[in-house]
A protein has these predicted regions:
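Intrinsic disorder in cytosolic terminal tails and internal cytosolic loops
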Residues: 1-7, 193-196, 456-478
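12-transmembrane solute porter fold
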Residues: 8-31, 227-241, 247-425, 430-463, ...
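A residue-level signal for alpha-helical anchor/packing sites in multi-pass solute transporters
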Residues: 35-36, 123, 127, 158, ...
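A gly/Pro-rich, aromatic-decorated transmembrane alpha-helix motif that marks the paired
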Residues: 143, 147-163, 212, 216, ...
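C-terminal membrane-cytosol helix-exit motif in multi-pass small-molecule transporters
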Residues: 173-192, 208-220, 237-252, 449-459
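Transmembrane-helix bundle of Major Facilitator Superfamily
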Residues: 1-185, 319-321, 328, 332-342, ...
Length: 478
């Protein structure tokens, strides 16, 4: 593909609008969840959680498949298909008249998101040449990817309070249609032009089913316990299916995932580091939202507004990171971000039950925003640098899967830790005590991501990565 046949920055704007919708819908529902429970007569909180879980289940489950199929059949094509599915599902969510309908339509929305996200990242990687240009583009994409989660809390509260919970879904319809029309006009098509002897259907089925079983088990672990049948059986199924997938890939003529791609040290390191970092970072929104509602007594809209400084900090940090990474390398920039994020988690772990927003929560939010903004862009760049265009969709699918599964695993483990250190869930002081342990665990996850990055990217590996990518003028790793 000719990278200069279209204005790449127009393409980036279109991609960012689509990605914004995807990350927005991962959090926007949380603020309106109890309004939805009342309106659609959910029988219990256990059934209510499926409004969130069904989206995550299909999103995480189909990411890898969506990324690889986009490589083979056309990234733009699957980006457009994902937009259509996501937009139609959003409309159906908004007009749902029963709990079952909403859960089913949210699953469909998650499927659309799984087609959009890897295609979006791979389109950026194939549109922008390696080096400063791609670094700046990924800085913008990273700010949208992280900041959109915080905006979702604000927008969800505003729409629910001023209009109706249905508008948290309806808002996607005009945005989706406009993004679709713009993508048809401006986004160039690209795909792997090599001749293929067939498609790895068995690999596609096993990895998708395996990832869905894993996320399903994680979703039930905090509510039912790690030894519950609802948790253990999906984990066993996931282990069998994913082991079968690896075996299939070693024997397939046209594997869905060429296992040799993990020999690219930057990709392997980026995925492991992001898996661990997201295990801690994802919980930040969840437990801080609970702290704001339960300890500080904020309402839905005010809770969303409390995260606005975080959004601003992420935007600033991602911009700074995209400027620094080409000069000093992605590893030191990401390392500083991880250290700042660990500091933020430690501050959160010390918040008192009678604390105030300005003195007890805001400092951690600001430091955390600078840290997370500095992590996301360099690690994303590391995951996509030094690869052929034909592998960008696969790399994007792997990277997005690492985030989603890492986030689900981290939230499940940290929720269990919080619960085990909470004497009485109805007593705010006890709940906050549990949050402290959860944030401490989150700090450990992020610290481990730093250890993994430093340990795996040793000097000779860094030299090898830079030598492989030197022709493209890649951003230095060290």
């Amino acid at each position: 593909m000719n990278r200069h046949s279209v204005n790449p920055w127009i393409v980036l704007v279109i991609i960012c609008f689509a990605q914004f919708m995807v990350v927005l819908d991962a959090t926007i529902v949380n603020v309106a969840i109890y309004n939805i429970k009342s309106a659609l007569h959910f029988g219990s909180d256990a059934s209510l959680q499926w409004v969130v879980t069904s989206y995550t289940l299909f999103f995480a489950g189909f990411l890898l498949l969506g990324g690889r199929v986009g490589d083979l059949l056309g990234r733009k094509r699957f980006f457009l298909v994902g937009l259509v599915v996501f937009t139609v599902a959003s409309l159906l969510d908004g007009i749902a008249t029963s709990s079952g309908q909403l859960i089913a339509f949210r699953a469909l929305q998650g499927l659309g998101a799984a087609l959009i996200s890897p295609a979006a990242l791979s389109i950026i990687s194939t549109t922008f040449a390696e080096g400063k240009e791609r670094a700046r583009a990924l800085g913008v994409w990273a700010a949208i990817a992280i900041g959109g989660s915080a905006v979702g809390l604000v927008l969800g509260g505003a729409l629910t309070q001023s209009l109706s919970w249905r508008w948290i879904f309806f808002i996607n319809v005009p945005v989706g249609i406009l993004t679709l029309l713009a993508a048809v006009r401006f986004v160039p098509e690209s795909k792997d032009e090599h001749e293929h002897k067939g498609y790895d259907l068995a690999g596609a089925v096993t990895v998708t089913a395996g990832l869905m079983a894993l996320v399903y088990g994680l979703a039930h672990s905090s509510a039912h316990g790690w030894s519950s049948t609802w948790t253990v059986v999906p984990f066993i199924a996931a282990a069998i299916l994913l082991a079968a997938f690896v075996l299939i890939e070693t024997r397939s003529v046209e594997p869905l995932v060429r296992l040799s791609i993990f020999r690219v040290r930057s990709l392997l390191t980026a995925n492991l580091a992001m898996f661990l970092a997201f295990s801690g970072m994802f919980a930040m929104f969840f437990f801080n939202s609970l702290y704001i509602r339960e300890a500080l007594g904020f309402g839905a809209l005010k809770t969303g507004l409390a995260f606005l400084p975080f959004t601003g900090g992420v935007m600033v940090s991602a911009g700074i990171a995209s400027g620094l990474a080409p000069k000093i390398g992605v590893r030191p920039v990401a390392a500083v971000g991880m250290i700042l994020t660990v500091i933020a988690m430690i501050l959160f772990a010390r918040m008192p039950v009678d604390g105030s927003y300005a003195t007890d929560l805001l400092p951690g939010l600001l430091i955390g925003s600078l840290g997370m903004g500095a992590i996301f862009m360099p690690i994303t760049l590391m995951a996509t640098t030094g690869l052929k265009d034909s592998d960008q969709g696969l790399a994007s699918g792997l990277f997005n899967t690492s985030q989603q599964v890492g986030g689900a695993l981290g939230l499940a483990i940290l929720s269990t830790i919080a619960t085990s250190h909470t004497a009485n869930q109805k007593v705010v002081a006890d709940a906050v005590h549990g949050f402290h342990y959860a944030f401490a665990g989150a700090a450990v996850f992020v610290a481990l991501s730093l250890v993994v990055m430093v340990a795996l990217l040793r000097a000779h590996h860094v030299a090898q990565i830079q030598a492989e990518a030197a022709e493209g003028g890649a951003v230095p790793v060290a």
